[in-house]
UniProtKB/Swiss-Prot annotation:
<keyword id="KW-0446">Lipid-binding</keyword>
<dbReference type="InterPro" id="IPR027417">
    <property type="entry name" value="P-loop_NTPase"/>
</dbReference>
<dbReference type="GO" id="GO:0005886">
    <property type="term" value="C:plasma membrane"/>
</dbReference>
<dbReference type="InterPro" id="IPR001957">
    <property type="entry name" value="Chromosome_initiator_DnaA"/>
</dbReference>
<feature type="binding site">
    <location>
        <position position="182"/>
    </location>
    <ligand>
        <name>ATP</name>
    </ligand>
</feature>
<dbReference type="InterPro" id="IPR024633">
    <property type="entry name" value="DnaA_N_dom"/>
</dbReference>
<keyword id="KW-0547">Nucleotide-binding</keyword>
<dbReference type="InterPro" id="IPR010921">
    <property type="entry name" value="Trp_repressor/repl_initiator"/>
</dbReference>
<feature type="binding site">
    <location>
        <position position="180"/>
    </location>
    <ligand>
        <name>ATP</name>
    </ligand>
</feature>
<keyword id="KW-0238">DNA-binding</keyword>
<dbReference type="Pfam" id="PF00308">
    <property type="entry name" value="Bac_DnaA"/>
</dbReference>
<dbReference type="GO" id="GO:0008289">
    <property type="term" value="F:lipid binding"/>
</dbReference>
<keyword id="KW-0067">ATP-binding</keyword>
<dbReference type="GO" id="GO:0003688">
    <property type="term" value="F:DNA replication origin binding"/>
</dbReference>
<comment type="function">
    <text>Plays an essential role in the initiation and regulation of chromosomal replication. ATP-DnaA binds to the origin of replication (oriC) to initiate formation of the DNA replication initiation complex once per cell cycle. Binds the DnaA box (a 9 base pair repeat at the origin) and separates the double-stranded (ds)DNA. Forms a right-handed helical filament on oriC DNA; dsDNA binds to the exterior of the filament while single-stranded (ss)DNA is stabiized in the filament's interior.</text>
</comment>
<feature type="region of interest" description="Domain I, interacts with DnaA modulators">
    <location>
        <begin position="1"/>
        <end position="91"/>
    </location>
</feature>
<dbReference type="InterPro" id="IPR038454">
    <property type="entry name" value="DnaA_N_sf"/>
</dbReference>
Length: 471
């Protein structure tokens, strides 16, 4: 593990005295970095590095801004050090230092060969312009594990990436699902695929919050026309977590007009959120309607098999050995989201490396005790009744009443279905919690909801959202 912390003193840049023999080694490191990461990532981030010198085994590399430095420290420093040590046994550390005099900016990465028609306003893979957010090099299609919960979203994202123009019925592509299930991964994967393809397209990828920030900044600086021109000149606009424009009236107005302008120009939009378009509370109906124009693909909760596959791919990429029974233990017990699952694996592997002992189920249980408790939070029938009543806008006492109005009966059946699915209560006990109903009523409710979910996508979305909220 590389220590990315550094003192001010360590980052003082000393003027090179003559040749230290490091130039040839640095060229070797640069070649290995380009070969490993590819031209797109290298040109976006690593081409900014300038070799300063080797001071008794401490290599100093310069970058023009602190942002570039911090990004390289987090994402690339370990491999840079490894390649330096491959080139020279005497190197023990690499420091990244900011120097205003470097004067090196990475290439605009609209296309791997740098050939761009007209002035580039959007860059994929970096934030040296003021539109796009950085892309994570780990988030590619090759690193995405496909299973039943995400196969539609994956296929749709891949199809958009491979097509040179918007596909009828898939514009916009709207991806939705809970936190940490892979929406952002797929959006980054689309961008990386296009970036490395032979088709020249300008892409803007950013969060809804950053879109709002850019819009407000443009208003304050009276650059609103430039803002409009830049966002409406892209070939693909990707906006992550669009639910965050909820309640922001002026931002929604601008997003609406940007959306329309791009659709009118036959440009592709990819949008993500934590819920379906119709469930985006606080978002204008006209926007929700447009978000549902194209293909709406949900990413459901992961299955055991999918979680296990993700862990197996992860350890393969890490180059470490973890017994399969430990992977199965993690896949069985950490169900919240992929982010937590991968974080748990990282924690277990790091602990094993530090203490020098193999990973076992017992050691993993101890290391992850807090996380395991959180993932086994007890869901009660009372919690379900309260949440369902709030969700459907009925009174809590309607859960127990004998009234059979459809507006009350359907939420009550949903609550029974969730109680059967999320608790360990017996059917008779569940029935008693709903005003003394018998187990046959609960069975009927469960079967009804299962049948309705097959035919009613909106109800299925609502129930999946309730499950995420309860867990």
């Amino acid at each position: 593990m590389v220590d990315v912390s550094e003192t001010t003193e360590r980052c003082v840049v000393h003027k090179r005295q003559g040749q230290d023999g490091g130039d040839a080694a640095w060229r070797g490191v640069q070649k290995k970095l380009r070969d490993f990461y590819g031209s797109a990532i290298y040109d976006s981030w690593l081409s900014a590095l300038v070799y300063s010198g080797n001071e008794n085994g401490r290599v100093v590399l310069l970058v023009p801004t602190r942002f570039i430095k911090e990004w390289i420290l987090v994402h690339y420093l370990e491999r840079i050090l490894k390649y330096w040590q491959d080139e020279s046994d005497a190197v023990y550390s690499v420091d990244i230092c900011v120097s205003d005099g470097v004067g090196v900016q990475p290439q605009m990465a609209e296309h791997p060969d740098g050939a761009v028609d007209g002035p580039p306003v959007v860059m994929v893979g970096g934030t040296y312009d003021h539109l796009s957010s950085p892309l994570d090099p780990r988030f590619t299609f090759d690193n995405f594990v496909v299973g039943k919960p995400n196969e539609l979203a994956f296929a749709a994202a891949r199809r958009v990436a491979e097509s040179s123009a918007p596909i009828p019925g898939s514009n916009p592509l709207f991806l939705y699902g809970g936190v940490g299930l892979g929406k952002t991964h797929l959006m980054h994967a689309i961008a990386w695929y296009i970036l490395n393809s032979s088709v020249k397209r300008k892409i803007a990828y950013l969060s809804a919050e950053k879109f709002m920030y850019q819009y407000v900044t443009a208003l304050r600086s009276k650059d609103i026309m430039l803002f409009k021109e830049q966002f409406r000149s892209v070939d693909i606009l990707m906006v992550d977590d669009v639910q965050f424009i909820s309640g922001k009236d002026s931002t929604q107005e601008e997003f609406f007009h940007t959306f329309n302008a791009l659709i009118d120009q036959n440009k592709q939009l990819v949008i993500s959120a934590d819920r379906s378009p119709s469930d985006l509370d606080g978002v204008e109906d006209r926007i929700k309607s447009r978000l549902g124009w194209g293909l709406v693909a949900d990413i459901n909760e992961t299955t055991f098999e999918l979680r296990l596959g993700i862990l197996q791919l992860k350890i393969e990429k890490m180059g470490v050995h973890v017994p399969n029974e430990v992977l199965e233990f993690l896949a069985k017990n950490i169900k919240s989201n992929i982010r937590e699952l991968e974080g748990a694996l990282n924690k277990v592997v790091a602990h094993s490396s530090l203490v020098g002992r193999s990973v076992t189920i017992e050691s993993a249980s101890g290391i992850l005790s807090d996380l395991l408790r959180a993932n086994h939070r007890m869901v009660t029938v009372g919690m379900i009744q309260k949440k369902v009543a709030e969700f459907f806008g009925i009174k809590l006492e309607d859960m127990y009443s004998a009234r059979r109005l459809r507006a009350l009966a359907r939420p009550r059946q949903v609550a029974m279905y969730l109680a059967k699915r999320l608790t360990q209560k017996s059917l008779p006990d569940i029935g008693k919690s709903f005003g003394g109903r018998d187990h046959a009523t609960v069975i009927h409710a469960v079967k009804q909801i299962e049948k309705f979910m097959e035919d009613d996508a909106k109800l299925a979305d609502d129930i999946n959202l309730l499950i995420r909220m309860l867990r």
